[in-house]
């Protein structure tokens, strides 16, 4: 009977009764990961990692392989869905102060960096114009590292320019990294279950818990269904919504695209990179745009965990979201006025959030102490 009770308890897994829809994005991300690995496997069967054949093999998958177009579109649109979900997941963590669970937050940041690396390697594989030139620009940033830069770039390229060895190793990395993401996700979930999920109020959830199944599991299934429906709708009616028209042309090292830009989900980091005219400074800013998330648990000063009861912090948070969108938009534009200035101002505001937020928390504490 005790064994049955243990099994029952593990299935019920008590969770705070008031967690909202924002808590469903973890399960949606897991669904995205499963979708990407399964569709990626079928694409890898037909893909050829050779600079002369890669573009043709992608065309072959789309035209000749039964349901190849489904796999290719699901994989491409699924990547965008993955990033939409992860950005919402991170925003939820910032808003509700979930970063105070340090181990979960830091493992999540490592997951984000790994995911971005995986997506970048994947974007290069079709060997279209934008794939080639995005790879050239981004990998060239390694040369900004003093002393080691040139050696690292040559090692990554497998030669003195982006060529066949580069594509081969990018394919190998793109294939292996999702399994690292699975491992990191397992660690992320195990660490989360040490303390358990928090809730929108930021209060101790132990006083009011309900079984995970059926209450929250059905809620998860609903949101996963909404996500998959959206995914298939985009695939059916606008399959090239997130694609760059430039990438429908085969890579040509002799012709530079008018405006080099990565996929939309990297544009905020790329916009920050472009806003700094110095190569090393831009590279550091690019890295810091993601790594700065790791500072959040150590700079939280407010006595209140969630922003739900902090109107000034809410204004600051929504300014960050607007800034993120602004940087993404400016990164799609050419490097010319007024976009340069807008991008620079937005980049300053983006980083300012992580400086102003702890100061604001300290000010709020002072005000609350004065009032009490």
Swiss-Prot record:
* Transmembrane region(s): 25-45, 69-90, 105-125, 170-190, 218-238, 280-300, 312-332, 339-358
Binding, heme b b562: 75, 174
This entry carries the following GO cellular component terms, namely:
mitochondrial inner membrane; respiratory chain complex III
Q: Which residues bind a ubiquinone?
A: 193
Q: How does it assemble?
A: The cytochrome bc1 complex contains 3 respiratory subunits (MT-CYB, CYC1 and UQCRFS1), 2 core proteins (UQCRC1 and UQCRC2) and probably 6 low-molecular weight proteins.
The record's misc note reads: Heme 1 (or BL or b562) is low-potential and absorbs at about 562 nm, and heme 2 (or BH or b566) is high-potential and absorbs at about 566 nm.
Protein name in UniProt = Cytochrome b
What is the taxonomic lineage of the source species?
Eukaryota, Metazoa, Chordata, Craniata, Vertebrata
């Amino acid at each position: 009977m005790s064994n049955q009770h243990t099994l029952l308890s593990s299935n019920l897994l008590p969770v705070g009764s008031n967690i909202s829809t924002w808590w469903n994005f973890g399960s949606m991300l897991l669904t995205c990961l499963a979708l990407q690995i399964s569709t990626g496997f079928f694409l890898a069967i037909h893909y050829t990692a050779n600079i002369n054949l890669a573009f043709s093999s992608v065309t072959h998958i789309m035209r000749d392989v039964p349901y190849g177009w489904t796999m290719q579109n699901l994989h491409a649109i699924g990547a965008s869905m993955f990033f939409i979900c992860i950005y919402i997941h991170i925003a939820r963590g910032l808003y509700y102060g979930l970063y105070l669970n340090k181990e979960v937050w830091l493992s999540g940041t490592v997951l984000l960096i790994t995911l971005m690396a995986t997506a970048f390697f994947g974007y290069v594989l079709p060997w279209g114009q934008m794939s080639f030139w995005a790879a050239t620009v981004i990998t060239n940033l390694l040369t900004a590292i003093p002393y080691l830069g040139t050696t690292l770039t040559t090692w990554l390229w497998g030669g003195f320019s982006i060529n066949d060895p580069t594509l081969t190793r990018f394919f190998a990395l793109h294939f292996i990294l999702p399994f690292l993401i699975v491992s990191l996700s397992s660690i992320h979930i195990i660490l989360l279950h040490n303390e358990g999920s928090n809730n929108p109020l930021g209060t101790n959830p132990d006083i009011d818990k309900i079984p995970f199944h059926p209450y929250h599991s059905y809620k998860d299934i609903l949101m996963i269904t909404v996500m998959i429906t959206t995914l298939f709708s985009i695939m059916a009616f606008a399959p090239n919504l997130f694609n760059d028209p430039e990438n429908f042309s085969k890579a040509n090292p002799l012709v530079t695209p008018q405006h080099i830009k990565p996929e939309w989900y990297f544009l905020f980091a790329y916009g920050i990179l472009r806003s700094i005219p110095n190569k090393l400074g831009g590279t550091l800013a690019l890295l810091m745009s993601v790594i700065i998330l790791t500072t959040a648990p150590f700079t939280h000063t407010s006595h209140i965990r969630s922003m739900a009861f902090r109107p000034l912090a809410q204004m600051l948070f929504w300014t960050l979201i607007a800034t993120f969108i602004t940087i993404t938009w400016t990164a799609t534009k050419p490097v010319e006025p007024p976009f340069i200035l807008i991008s620079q101002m937005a980049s300053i505001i983006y980083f300012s959030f992580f400086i102003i937020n702890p100061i604001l928390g300290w000010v709020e504490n002072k005000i609350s102490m004065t009032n009490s």
